[in-house]
Design a protein with these regions (language model features):
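Mid-domain alpha/beta scaffold segments of enzyme catalytic cores
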Residues: 1-258
Length: 258
């Protein structure tokens, strides 16, 4: 490859997940030309860790502020109040991860919708981009997003798992599709989505420490594996890995103003 670098648009690089080798994980990412990583926030409790590591690596790690849908519980309003206070932090590049997750637990179904709307309002007020998590709830999430159509939201549908209709709606409404290591797995539909939408609609992500690509499937994931995802996308689209790197980096820098 020529000069240039990758961006991992979604990775949970917290010390909680890498207690023994955090610095080495960052160094390995940089060695593999993954020079920028966007760090989603999942709850108020994750803020100290996120801000600590982003201060350590200010040129490489870029924090978001948000409440993950599976972290929505009976005290979600107080969590949102704490998170909202940090929106003005000059290092924060976006909001997320927020969204709808009906796969794990529907106990706080209504609260998830309310928390999602609150964070979409933050995006409207601050003009910050979004990292959106949707699992088993595309129709529900899109019904909320459509209320904000006039707000001209932008962002990434992280770890995209929808069909082609959802993909086209997202792209038409200012969102990139976050493509993770799942694209390297055998018998997955994500490769068909990638073929259909093309490289201009794609952001690379690991979702580390989860969803490691083949041949590391089932093991701890890290940002250094982004080139593996890029190689698979290059193969699917019949373009060079250099082009995947260049265009996806431009895509993510445009969305998050990195």
């Amino acid at each position: 490859m020529t000069n240039g670098y990758f961006i991992d648009s979604h990775a949970h690089l917290y010390r909680e997940y890498y207690p023994d080798d955090f610095r080495e994980v960052i160094e390995r990412a940089i060695e593999h030309r993954v020079e920028k990583v966007v760090l989603p926030c999942v709850s108020a409790e994750s803020l100290p860790d996120i801000f600590e590591v982003t201060l350590q690596f200010p040129k490489n790690l870029f924090p978001l502020i948000g409440l993950h849908p599976t972290d929505v519980n009976q005290d979600y309003k107080s969590q949102l109040a704490v998170l909202e206070k940090h929106l003005s932090n000059k290092n924060v590049v976006g909001i997320g991860e927020t969204g709808i997750d009906l796969y794990h637990d529907k106990t706080f179904y209504k609260e998830q919708f309310d928390a999602f709307e609150v964070q979409l309002n933050w995006a409207t007020e601050t003009c910050l981009p979004l990292s959106i998590h949707i699992r088993d709830g595309f129709n529900e999430a899109l019904s909320v997003l459509k209320k904000f159509k006039s707000a001209q939201l932008r962002g990434i549908l992280h770890c995209f798992s929808g069909g082609i209709q959802e993909a086209k709606w997202a792209i038409d409404n200012g969102f990139l599709l976050g493509i993770s290591g799942v694209v390297t797995f055998k018998k997955n539909k994500l490769q068909d989505i990638v073929k259909e939408v093309g490289i201009s609609a794609i952001a690379l992500e690991t979702d580390a420490p989860f969803l490691a690509p083949d041949p590391y499937r089932g093991k701890r994931n890290e940002s250094a594996y982004i080139p593996i995802i890029a190689e698979k996308i290059a193969e699917v689209l019949e373009i060079s890995a250099e082009e995947v790197m260049r265009i996806t980096t431009e895509n993510v820098e445009r969305i998050f103003n990195l």
